[in-house]
From Swiss-Prot:
It comes from the Bacteria. This is Putative multidrug resistance protein MdtD. The keyword Cell membrane applies. The keyword Signal does not apply. One of its GO terms (cellular component) is plasma membrane.
Length: 470
């Protein structure tokens, strides 16, 4: 990194800053949800829409971000992403109702969707290929620190200021980032093929409508017949996209991707797997505060061991997969995550709070091994010509499945609980216990998919510490 020109190093710092903002925002909000509910006069059972609106918007917008950067320029799009994210943060802080907050989170999600993929594209264009791995390690490190700081920082701001400050802190940082981007980042553009707008709209409508249909009766009071119509419309949009992609060589995502068996299995497993695991970062701080009566700051601190376990496991997961193979690792970690989630609930309800950090550390380790294995299984056998498209589709599916997971978690809470549930009461404990039992089943089900993964015939390359630091 020291051999790079000064202006290139500054550009990498700007990208790293964008990664940090986006990753921090994905975790800082969860700790504040109970306080937001109280301030807005809403039931905590409805607050999952604050998370879903952001993550679903990211999923919808991801396919367009790379094309926009190539067409309009990486500087212009990265600048627009930071501005939209910052404006969304301002509107979030000014929101006086849940509906206003959800709309502001959608605007934030549009900016967040463009930040990370455009940042990766920027690094590819400004750094020589020989230094690409070192540069990506540098810019993604803040993205790993964001989830570590997010829960605790969110807890501090909520407890000692107000929930509005989890959004207000983005404003001065966003202004500085936007100015630095405009002044220092080059505006690379390349010739692009025509954007598949019909395919993009079909996928966007399908994803949004199906997610809305999952929880519309609880959160929005939509009638069952209307929900059935929404579900049918969403499914029809997805089917129309498949027909469109079959006939169109320039489709957003080519159906040739699914000729690779490991990609099909991995994508299906990733979708199902992240529905279950996507519930945990949302449900855990909510349960700690509403179910156990923890303060926001205490609940935020309890999330740190989970992030530390996740970061630590990334260093050894390749060796584990090489030793035991994808099928065994994925089946074991899927079932293991379900068991650890039940262990967490058991330890919490028994009052053994001193064991909770250890259980959450274990949960983070198991979840990280599962995530890394799912990602590499999905992409490892794709031909070079389809690798970029496959990676984009996987990124979209990851965000979509997490939004569905949070939606289902909120739906389960609403099904087992009343309109308002009390803090640290016996009835509340039962609501969360039944919810966690259902979550454990949902988390375990993808093991059926992963049991079909073929035996491995190829070892994964392990990057030494020396190469990591180059």
């Amino acid at each position: 990194m020291t051999e790079l020109p000064d202006n290139t190093r500054w550009q990498l710092w700007i990208v790293a800053f964008g990664f940090f903002m986006q990753s921090l925002d994905t975790t800082i909000v969860n700790t504040a949800l109970p306080s937001m509910a109280k301030s807005l006069g809403e039931s905590p059972l409805h607050m999952h829409m604050v998370v879903v609106s952001y993550v679903l918007t990211v999923a919808v917008m991801l396919p367009a971000s790379g094309w926009l950067a190539d067409k309009i320029g990486v500087r212009n799009i990265f600048f627009a992403a930071i501005v939209l994210f910052t404006l969304g943060s301002l509107f979030c802080a000014l929101s006086g109702t849940l509906n206003q907050l959800v709309l502001a989170r959608v605007l934030q999600g549009v900016g967040g969707a463009m930040m990370v993929p455009v940042g990766r594209l920027t690094v590819m264009k400004i750094v020589p290929r020989a230094q690409y791995m070192a540069a990506m390690t540098f810019v993604t490190l803040p993205g790993q620190i964001g989830p570590l700081l997010g829960p605790a920082l969110g807890g501090v701001l909520v407890e000692y200021a107000s929930w509005h400050w989890i959004f207000l802190i983005n404003i001065p940082v966003g202004i500085v980032g936007a100015i630095a981007t405009f002044m220092l980042m080059p505006n690379y553009t390349i010739e692009t093929r025509r954007f598949d707008l019909p395919g993009f709209l079909l996928l966007a409508i399908g994803m949004a409508v199906l997610t809305l249909a999952l929880d519309g009766s609880k959160s929005m009071g939509i009638s069952p017949w209307t929900l059935a119509g929404l579900a049918a419309g969403g499914a029809a949009a997805i089917l129309l996209y498949l027909l469109h992609a079959k006939k169109n060589s320039g489709a957003l995502f080519s159906l040739r991707l699914f000729r690779t068996p490991t990609f099909s299995l991995g994508l299906l497993g990733s979708f199902a797997g992240r529905i279950g695991s996507g519930m945990l970062p949302f449900m855990t701080p909510v349960f700690l505060q509403i179910g156990l009566g923890f303060s926001p700051f205490h609940a935020g601190l309890m999330m740190i061991p989970m992030v530390l376990g996740s970061m630590g496991m990334k260093r050894i997961v390749v060796q584990i997969v090489n030793r035991f193979g994808y099928r065994r690792v994925l089946v074991a970690t899927t079932l293991g995550l379900a068991l650890v989630s039940l262990l967490f609930m058991s330890v919490a309800l028994l009052g053994w709070y001193y064991l909770l950090p250890l259980v959450l550390l274990l949960q983070g380790m198991v979840n990280s091994a599962r995530f890394s294995s799912m990602n590499t299984l999905t992409l490892k056998d794709l031909p070079d010509t389809l690798a970029s498209s496959g990676n984009s589709l996987l990124s979209m599916i990851m965000q979509l499945s997490m939004s569905i997971g949070v939606t289902i978690a909120g739906m389960l809470l609403g099904m087992f609980g009343q309109q308002h549930i009390g803090i640290d009461s016996s009835a509340t404990h039962h609501v969360f216990m039944y919810t966690w039992l259902c979550m454990a089943v949902i988390i375990a089900l993808p093991a059926i998919i992963f049991a079909r993964v073929p035996n491995d015939t190829q070892q994964n390359m392990v990057i030494s510490r020396r190469k990591r630091s180059l």
